[in-house]
């Protein structure tokens, strides 16, 4: 049996374009995706290009802290 902390953790990815537009009130919302990452293989923050339904294009999504 494994002891200690779980290796796989759930993370939330957030669109950085929507966050920047939030200050200008142009965006209707903020796109967020939920996924898992392996803490040992990727100790840094995740960054993916995913589709944002509010921007209507593929944008960079960064991991946010809970």
UniProtKB/Swiss-Prot annotation:
Top-level taxon in the UniProt lineage: Eukaryota
Coiled coil: none
Annotated keywords: Chloroplast, Plastid, Ribonucleoprotein, Ribosomal protein
Protein's cellular compartments: Plastid, Chloroplast
Gene3D superfamilies: Ribosomal protein L33 (2.20.28.120)
Stored PROSITE patterns: RIBOSOMAL_L33
Pfam families found in the cross-reference section: Ribosomal_L33
One GO cellular component term noted in the UniProt record for this chain: ribosome
Main location per the UniProt record: plastid
InterPro entries the UniProt entry points to: Ribosomal_bL33, Ribosomal_bL33_CS, Ribosomal_bL33_sf, Ribosomal_zn-bd
A biological process from GO: translation
Gene Ontology molecular-function annotations: structural constituent of ribosome
Entry-linked SUPFAM superfamilies: Zn-binding ribosomal proteins
Family: Belongs to the bacterial ribosomal protein bL33 family.
HAMAP family: Ribosomal_bL33
PANTHER family to which the protein is assigned, alphabetical: 50S RIBOSOMAL PROTEIN L33, CHLOROPLASTIC, LARGE RIBOSOMAL SUBUNIT PROTEIN BL33C
Protein name: Large ribosomal subunit protein bL33c
Species whose genome carries this gene: Brachypodium distachyon (Purple false brome)
Gene (name only): rpl33
């Amino acid at each position: 049996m494994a002891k200690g902390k779980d290796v796989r953790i759930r993370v939330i990815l957030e669109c950085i374009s929507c966050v920047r537009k939030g200050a200008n009130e142009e965006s209707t919302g903020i796109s967020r995706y939920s996924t898992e990452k392996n803490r040992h293989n990727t100790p840094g923050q995740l960054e993916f290009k995913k589709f944002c339904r509010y921007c209507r294009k593929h944008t960079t999504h960064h991991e946010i802290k809970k």
